[in-house]
Amino acid sequence: MVGRVSASPSRNSTRHMPNKLLSLVVPVYFNAGSLPGLFAELEVVEQQLRARALDLELIFVNDGSGDESLRELFKIKTKRPATKIINLSRNFGVIAATKTGFRFVTGDVFGILAADLQDPPQQVLEMADHWIAGHKFVISVRTAREDPWLSRLLSRLYYRVIGWIVAPGYPAGGYDLMLMDKSMLGHLVNSTKHTNVALYAFWLGFNPAILYYVRRKRQHGKSRFTLGKRLKFLIDTISGFSATPIRMMSVFGIIVAILSFIYGTHIVISALLGDFDIRGFATLAALISFFSGLILFMLGVLGEYLWRVFAAVNNVPEAVVDETFL
């Protein structure tokens, strides 16, 4: 007897595959003015992501803002309860805030978006398309920026130095807007303290897909990234990724030692021949002052490297979470 074969399709064949999840980490620091507009744009982005079979996870990290940023974040959560809010106990800096946000990522792909609206949220859609196409790492490089001339100059110098000393091939316009596969998450979460997230992600490799965009003009508030913070950021980046300064010091020391040996030999021979005249006190004093200052500068450079080692091994947390609203 032949058994009856059911003509109805199997239950599994009609089941839809669940959407993938895209997580966006948004560090917030004195961004009360831009948050309503940012959320409005992200709502549009979320709808367009769903058309790509992607759900959106929003993770806002309030980095000790002294304005009404936290209140604005609560308004966003009221409208969209799935939004995650991480409130830090004080200001720890954008790197620490970003890495704290990474700890709450649950998506298949994750990225970083500035809260000041200078980076267009719609750029996330194009990056998502490249991730769907198979790229694990997608970055959006600034081709131009509508910032004050001093800010543009300092940024240009910064990225030139980074490309020369730290990471040859690093995009000249720099980038903060990026999308990464979840396979990269563990590397970033476990990176050492004060590590430049964008540069470290680039250093990891993964053959990034590079997109381009024009950075918007700031419409709300003012930049809190002061000259002092820019300098500290540069020092942390160089000392965290490159041994070039120490090697330059070593090469310079060898050159000075060789020249000193030659000059010392000349003095000894001149003295033995009776042709030695003590002159040039002003020149000698200037040289001593110059090399003393240079030695102190080199000690400072070594101190920066030693400080990074100390910061990496001590038990002080990179950031302290005060409250979470998940």
Question: What is the role of each PLM region?
Answer:
Residues K84-I86, G169, A209:
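Structural signal for short hydrophobic segments within the conserved structured cores
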Residues V2, P9-L21, L199-L326:
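Hydrophobic helical membrane-anchoring modules
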Residues L88-R90, V94-F104, P121-T195, R216-I235:
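Acceptor/aglycone-binding surface of glycosyltransferases and processive sugar-polymer synthases
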Residues P9-D147:
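Structured catalytic core of nucleotide-sugar glycosyltransferases
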Residues T78, R103, D129, A133, ...:
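Solvent-exposed polar/charged
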